[in-house]
Amino acid sequence: MYRLRTASQKYSIVFALLALVIWTVLLLGISMLLPYPLLRWDPYLPQLLLDTLLAAGGIGMLSLLGDLSILRFSGKQFGKRLLVGGYFLLIGASSLIQNLASADRGTIRSPGHLLLFVLSMLMIGVAEEITFRGVIATLLFRRYGKTTSGVWFCVIASGILFGCPHLINAIGGGSALTGVLVQAVSAVGSGMVFTAMYYRTIWVPILLHAWIDFAGLIVSGLYGEGTIGTVISSYSLWQMVSVLPYLIIAAYLLRDTKMQEILQTTKSDSALSSTI
């Protein structure tokens, strides 16, 4: 364990890329093994199973790297960081209202299907944030997060690595390429903000991530209209401008006073790691 942690500090980029590869292989492998009848009964059931297994894989990587403390919950820090994520709360609420207002009001699905949808959205946030913030961002911060330029590198690199796997949605024609590109670019921006917001606390990014997905897919979950793939296909190129607010927010979160907090935290983590 000690040797693995030491190696991950020395070769953090290699380990970050390895974590991305492991996560992607798990994603593709599990997706192919899930029984097709589950998809026909409710598309969110296999999604829930997939993300539960991906979350377990992320926790396994955290355990190997000795970083399970990231999963600790702090009520004080949670409330403070949730306020910082106010933009995500607002755009999620706006998306929710717009989607419901424009929906063809059909029959609301049964409570069981609605529960699957809610749990699925939550587990998407858990699975992706544990791996991309908990594992990958932590690896990068531990090695490069001791300087201002290093923190910026971590934020940008983490955002890019988060955006890349979203391109998988174009495989096999599951979603239109234009929509997938828009989703990937947006994921880069939101990933940068989540990384700038995250340092040693993972639960706020998880909740905000789940909220954004819940709001964006509410019509599909509530009425059964379309799937995740059809929603992604509906994105148009002009929606790429949504990345601009993310860049502005990331810059604000990395202002001088905030940067000093991050530098202090990452330096403390490095000092602790050297004694383990």
Q: What are these language model-derived features?
A:
Residues 1-9:
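Short, Lys/Arg-rich, polar N-terminal cytosolic tail immediately upstream
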Residues 12-65, 80-92, 111-116, 120, ...:
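Alpha-helical transmembrane segments in multi-pass membrane proteins
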Residues 21-29, 90-99, 159-168, 210-222:
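Aromatic-anchored segments of alpha-helical transmembrane domains
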Residues 24-29, 176-235:
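Functionally important transmembrane alpha-helices
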Residues 52, 118, 122, 126, ...:
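Residue-level signature of the transmembrane alpha-helical core
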Residues 63-70, 93-106:
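Transmembrane alpha-helix boundary signature
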Residues 130-157, 196-201:
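Membrane-interface helix/loop boundary segments of multi-pass membrane proteins
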Residues 210-276:
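C-terminal membrane module of polytopic membrane proteins
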